[in-house]
Swiss-Prot record:
The gene is SWEET7C. Residues 10-48, 110-191 form the MtN3/slv domain. It comes from Oryza sativa subsp. japonica. This is Bidirectional sugar transporter SWEET7c. Residues 1-9, 68-78, 130-140, 186-240 are extracellular. The chain crosses the membrane at residues 10-30, 47-67, 79-99, 109-129, 141-161, 165-185. The lineage of its organism: Eukaryota, Viridiplantae, Streptophyta, Embryophyta, Tracheophyta. Glycans are attached at N225, N235.
Amino acid sequence: MVSPDLIRNVVGIVGNVISFGLFLSPVPIFWRIIKNKNVQNFKADPILVVTINGISLVIEAVYLTIFFLFSDKKNKKKMGVVLATEALFMAAVAVGVLLGAHTHQRRSLIVGILCVIFGTIMYSSPLTIMVVKTKSVEYMPLLLSVVSFLNGLCWTLYALIRFDIFITIPNGLGVLFAIMQLILYAIYYRTTPKKQDKNLELPTVAPIAKDTSIVAPVSNDDDVNGSTASHATINITIEP
């Protein structure tokens, strides 16, 4: 009979793989930003939230750099404020936990509660409200929602095998949020305008026949106001 510990280890390994996929799922978004050299209506909120996750720091730093380079001044200012707030908050938490909580159990409880809060925000951040307002899923990528669902489901199962409330709550809520996003995607997918190539149509010009004469008006400097402009005939000869 397979032991619960073995099952938990296998699920944990799968969860790590899916989590890595979750952090890589925004790659198509940032390829699009680089290609268009504009962040369009994408938001930095999901990226700013998940930078708190240690294993994704390098990947998220790359995303933030790309977003910063192609953002306007308003978005750059917002990112700076949020990142500075995160850094100050994490420093305050570290100092507070080390100095105020003197037992491992108490420290784990405080940090665990914070992980529940920020983990829940991470799952709920991909622009659900914007989809409802615009009735378009253009800026809520399907890949991110699918991987979020798989990631939350896997880690929920992992936490239930040997119950861990700090893993169960954010990931269980993550599954619900991902299902909501997938339902919204199914509802608004058909109403999302499809991108079409805008080919510029240049006006066609009729060919000029050989030995064509063109009559054009010519202004006369000696004429006074109200006088009639004279005309000149221009002969055009096209050599073969």
